[in-house]
UniProtKB/Swiss-Prot annotation:
The lineage of its organism: Bacteria, Pseudomonadati, Pseudomonadota, Gammaproteobacteria, Alteromonadales. Residues 49-139 form the ATP-cone domain. The gene is nrdR. This is Transcriptional repressor NrdR. Its cofactor is Zn(2+). GO terms for biological process: negative regulation of DNA-templated transcription. One of its GO terms (molecular function) is double-stranded DNA binding. Negatively regulates transcription of bacterial ribonucleotide reductase nrd genes and operons by binding to NrdR-boxes.
Length: 149
């Protein structure tokens, strides 16, 4: 690793610790030439699978789109930003764990509904009504009845 102060190519690791629940390594380094110390963070580069849309087109996974959908569903509901971040993290972890290069958008929608169901029932109904394109009140009733079981 190059020293950010003098650009020397030789640095030594003084201390290493796991951070971010074990998903990153924090390293304290010292330059062997100028003796300045600096911190680096190391983490695995995890590639998200591509998304196969309902019409068959493929596009890169868009984390912002996932977050926007969840935020819209939980809008004005008693759900903390921490809970939202955890739910989004679970969805992304599940997608990575499939080991697939491509996943259908339907899978992402179903994962989103699972997370919303455990977070907030009203948010779940909001998302499901748009995602499943409810046409009339009876479809809302069926979704609510499913929640009450």
């Amino acid at each position: 690793m190059h020293c950010p102060f003098c650009s020397a190519t030789d640095t030594k690791v003084i201390d290493s610790r796991l951070v971010a629940e074990g998903h990153q390594v924090r390293r304290r380094r010292e330059c062997t030439e100028c003796h300045e110390r600096f911190t680096t963070f190391e983490g695995a580069e995890l590639v998200m699978p591509r998304v196969i849309k309902r019409d068959g087109t493929r596009q890169p996974f868009d984390e912002e789109k996932l977050q926007a959908g969840m935020l819209r569903a939980v809008e004005k509901r008693p759900v903390s930003m921490d809970e939202i971040e955890q739910a989004l993290s679970k969805i992304k972890s599940t997608l990575r764990a499939t080991g697939e290069r491509e996943v259908p958008s339907e899978m992402i929608g179903n994962l989103m509904m699972e997370q919303l169901m455990s977070l907030d029932k009203v948010a779940y109904i909001r998302f499901a009504s748009v995602y499943r394109a409810f046409e009339d009140v009876s479809e809302f009733g069926e979704a609510i009845a499913k929640l009450q079981k």
